[in-house]
Amino acid sequence: MLALKISVYTVVFFFVGIFLFGFLASDPTRTPNRKDLESPQD
């Protein structure tokens, strides 16, 4: 039972990590204007 929980948590965290990483990585690409908002001095 413990091994089952470990494998389930591993798979869940694996997919969640990929989802968050892909979302954060594609977020600035979809909104290039955000760079101007983050650095208005430029």
From Swiss-Prot:
One of its GO terms (biological process) is photosynthesis. Pfam families: PsbI. The keyword Chloroplast does not apply. Belongs to the PsbI family. One of the components of the core complex of photosystem II (PSII), required for its stability and/or assembly. PSII is a light-driven water:plastoquinone oxidoreductase that uses light energy to abstract electrons from H(2)O, generating O(2) and a proton gradient subsequently used for ATP formation. It consists of a core antenna complex that captures photons, and an electron transfer chain that converts photonic excitation into a charge separation. PSII is composed of 1 copy each of membrane proteins PsbA, PsbB, PsbC, PsbD, PsbE, PsbF, PsbH, PsbI, PsbJ, PsbK, PsbL, PsbM, PsbT, PsbX, PsbY, Psb30/Ycf12, peripheral proteins PsbO, CyanoQ (PsbQ), PsbU, PsbV and a large number of cofactors. It forms dimeric complexes. This is Photosystem II reaction center protein I. It comes from Prochlorococcus marinus (strain NATL2A).
